[in-house]
Amino acid sequence: AFSFTEQEQKFLWLMFFASFATKVPMLPMHIWLPEAHVEAPTAGSVILAGVLLKLGTYGFIRFSFPLFPFASLYFTPLVYSMASMAVVYTSLTAIRQTDLKRIIAYTSVAHMNLVMIGLFSFNVIGLEGAMLQSLSHGFVASALFLVIGVVYDRHHTRMVKYYGGLVHMMPLFTIIFLIFTMANIALPGTSSFVGELLILVGAYECNTTITFIGATGMVLGGGYSLWLFNRIVYGNLKTQYLKQFCDLEKREFFVFLPLIFGTLFMGVYPEVFLNVMHISINNLLDQIHFV
C-alpha cells in the first residue's frame, strides 16, 4: 500500500483535484461544458452528459479518497464552498439562457456539484446518494439532450423564443418531456429524488449551511425546468412552420424507452442499487476514517 506524508498528500491531492474538478465540472472550471454541448451533435451531448462527466466523480472515489485520505478530509471545506457556490450560480445562470442546450448544460453542472457535496460528506448516506445521483443524472440529462435533439431535427434552431405550443402537434413528445422535466426537479418517484434526498440528509450530518444552500439550488432547478417546459410545450404556436411538426417516430420513441424505464425503476426501487453499493462504500469509508 502507498503511504504519503501529510504534505505529500496535500500536494498530490491538489494535482488530482485540478483534473477531476475540471471534468466534473466544478466552479470556476465549468466554462468549457456549455460551449462543448452547444458545439456537439446530439449524440455527443448524450455521451458527454451520460458517461464522461461521471469520470470526474469516479476519479475522486477511486483515486483521491483511498490514496490521500488525510488530504481528502483536510480539503473538504474547499470542496463544499466551491460546490455550493456552483449549485446556486449555475442554477441562476440557467434561468438567463436563451439556447436550449446551454440551459441543460448548466443544469448538469448544478447536479454534478450536488453530487460533490454528497461525496465529501464522508458518510454512508451521502456517498450512496452521490453515486445514485450520478447514475440518475446519466439517464435524465441524456434524455433531456435527446428531447432537444428531437425538436432541433424538426426546426433546426435551439433558440427558446422560436418554440411554443408543441403540445398541440406532439402530444407523445410532451408526455416524455414532462417525465424527464419532473425527474430533473427531483419529483418523488423518479431517480433524482432518491439521490438528492440522500445527498442532503448525508450533508446535513456534516454541515447544515451547505445543506441549505444545496436545497436552494434544487428549488431554483424547479424554476428553470418548469419554465423551459412551459415555454416550449404550452402557449400559441410561434410560427406557421411549427404546425408541420410530426410527433415522435418509432425510432425516437424506442430510444427514450430504456431511459424512462431506468429513471422510474431507480426512483421506485432504489434499494436494488443501494444494496450493491453498501459494502464497497463502507470499505471506502473505513480507509478514510482510519486516518
What feature does the model see in each segment?
Residues 1-197, 201-226, 230:
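Hydrophobic transmembrane alpha-helices and their helix-loop junctions in integral membrane proteins
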Residues 170, 226-291:
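Cytoplasmic/organellar membrane-interface segments at the starts of transmembrane helices
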